[in-house]
Amino acid sequence: MAELNTHVNIKEKIYAVRSVVPNKSNNEIVLVLQQFDFNVDKAVQAFVDGSAIQVLKEWNMTGKKKNNKRKRSKSKQHQGNKDAKDKVERPEVGPLQPQAPLVQNGHMNGCEKDSSSPDSTREKLALTPREKKISILEEPPRAQRGVTEGGRLLQQKMSLDGNPRAIHGPSERSDGPQWSAGQPCNPSKPKAKTSPVKSNAPAAHLEIKPDELAKKRGPNIEKSVKDLQRCTVSLTRYRVMIKEEVDSSVKKIKAAFAELHNCIIDKEVSLMAEMDKVKEEAMDILTARQKKAEELKRLTDLASQMAEMQLAELRAEIKHFVSERKYDEELGKAARFSCDIEQLKAQILICGEITHPKNSYSSRTPCSSLLPLLNTHAVASGKQGNFARKSSGHNKPSEGKAANPKMVSGLANTADACHQTMPTNKQQNGPSSQRRRFNPQYHNRLNGPAKSQGGGNEADPMAKSNSRHEHRRQPHNGFRPKNKGGAKNQEAPLGTKAPEAPPHSEKARRRQHAADNLEARPFRGNVSRVSQCNLCPSRIEVSTEATVLSVPAVTLVA
């Protein structure tokens, strides 16, 4: 009983340490507690300080070269999968729990029957988990030679998760000895029962190994993908920035040249005003000179009345006036605009500067290992494009096939329209004597085999008149050199000879039906169906329509 309480205390200590350090496994906590004589405070301090790693290495945990971050991630993954593993382990641990007392008694076959009291049974159950723990703690040095770290951690978790179940419920404590007492001696059963546990470890190791590799590889590629995504988003932002910068630069250019334009206009206005002032000043000077010249001219007119002294002064005045002629020339050249346009052009050309983008990026080609992937991706995309084009090409003939019935129905509709317009055109086809002169003979020849069926065919003169009307409408449109052979072949089964129509009736028909070209064309399609229907009494009307098409062709050729 004391041993059971001791085990319960150990379990409580494990839970106490785990509450402070949740990312550590039970096996690691037990190892550190054993190192510090099951002192919870020292164990927690060791986990916090990081000295627990050295302690675990001392417990033959060599080969564990991973940092704390990797331990935390793995422990979180193990905690996430703990419930699923417990469900898988419960059916396997259940049958193994009753065998634990038999193994601990030193008898592997379990042949001895335990008839002791319940207290002894509880003591055996209490001893069982501790001895199992000690055996598990001693197993890693032997097992890690051929098993990787993932499989070893899974085996340790399975053993530690299986131990508390043997202690919890009173039903398990009481059922275990009863089952062992009631079982017969069978030395092969314990081996068969313990073998599944050994075989499950490699399987679990094989299942975990790809996941671990993916998780080792995953964070790196995820970080790269995130960096690539950020860079792509920033490219879009820079594109917007370039557009905004260009727009602002265009506005600045327009503003600068608008200011220059305004300055030029202002300068032009000022120069024009100054030129006006110069013109006025020059004109005033010339006006004064003109007045002085006129005054001297009047004095010269009075020279006959002057004395010698006055004449001498007049000559001096005229000489002085004439000597200032050079100033007149300078005055005429002074009113001139001068500007150094070339210098101004040079200043305008160097005015303003635009910085071009620098392509400082490296022209790095993809690695040789990535080129095959890119080529296969390009080939796959090309195949998909070809398949899409082929599928669209396959759909087009079906559309064409679907359009053909529409064309046939359109021909039929035009034929019906022509039949409906025939009675109205009968009044415009000339005198009825011409129709009687030609149609009765033709009617008697074609309807000869139809008379044996009684008066049924005589009751539809409208249909026959329609066929005669079609015969009159056909000569101009239906005549083509290609139809000569077909028309003669269609006349052969009838065994009849087409009579020559009177010339005046033919001319009348040509005048009457010159405007019906488009309505008569749809009936050419009936020629191919006539040869099959000539001998059918029930379809004599169709055959007459078809044979009527051939008669004018022979008539026109003759």
Swiss-Prot record:
Residues 63-204, 385-406, 421-514 are annotated as: Disordered. InterPro entries: SPATS2-like, UBA-like_sf. The lineage of its organism: Eukaryota, Metazoa, Chordata, Craniata, Vertebrata. This is SPATS2-like protein. Disulfide bonds: none annotated. The modification N-acetylalanine is found at residue 2. Keywords: Acetylation, Coiled coil, Cytoplasm, Nucleus, Phosphoprotein. Belongs to the SPATS2 family. The gene is Spats2l.
